[in-house]
Amino acid sequence: MTTQKIVPTKSTDGSKLFRHQAKFVAGAMNINQIPNFSLPEIAFVGKSNVGKSSLINTICSNKNLAKVSNTPGRTRQINFFNLADKLIIVDLPGYGFANVPISVKEQWGVLISYYLRNSYNLRLVNLLIDSRRGIKENDKKVADLLLANKREFQIIFTKSDKVTDHKNLHDEAQNFLATLNYSCNVMYVSNRSKEGARELKASLAKCIKPQK
């Protein structure tokens, strides 16, 4: 099994789309608050402090768009950002953070699971993995949930500037995908060096509805 490789072209690299300014449009702390924008949605999910909000800020060229904190568990609701009325970017709460009450963790779990299972407009899920930590059990559970609900996803290794050799990560991803019998993009991104930002934008731009 091989991962797909995105080769951005002038028409698909996402530069035109991400030239527009994204804006925060809604936050949902429970399932009843989840909005329906009737636009394609792409979601970012991963462990707490994996860099979801920072990555959204990087690809949108706005360091103040999604709130960023060095404290794990800061994102406590689903945040929705509108990009040019063409795409909704969804920042999900992180999972696996221990230093919150069990009731809060359960609430986040219900919220994340419900959104991933039920969002009608969800087109692509970006499963973020910390390059320094590798794929953990919680990540595998999320991947299982996505496959069970026929959700398309791609693996994004964050903080790639913190590791010197991507081969071990590549092999780990390949073995993981083989166990799932699934093939998808595997990317390496760094908010500091901007590595992988162009390829990621290209994959997201493909989720836009075609012009009629």
Curated annotation (Swiss-Prot):
Domain EngB-type G: 38-210
GO molecular function: GTP binding; metal ion binding
Annotated residues for binding of Mg(2+): 53, 75
GO biological process, one term: division septum assembly
Cofactors (names): Mg(2+)
UniProt-listed Pfam families: MMR_HSR1
PROSITE patterns xref list: G_ENGB (PS51706)
Keywords: Cell cycle, Cell division, GTP-binding, Magnesium, Metal-binding, Nucleotide-binding, Septation
Binding of GTP, residues: 46-53, 73-77, 91-94, 158-161, 189-191
Disulfide bonds: none
PANTHER family with a match to the protein in the record: ENGB-TYPE G DOMAIN-CONTAINING PROTEIN, MSS1/TRME-RELATED GTP-BINDING PROTEIN
Family: Belongs to the TRAFAC class TrmE-Era-EngA-EngB-Septin-like GTPase superfamily. EngB GTPase family.
Summary of the function given for this chain in its UniProt record: Necessary for normal cell division and for the maintenance of normal septation.
Protein name, entry field: Probable GTP-binding protein EngB
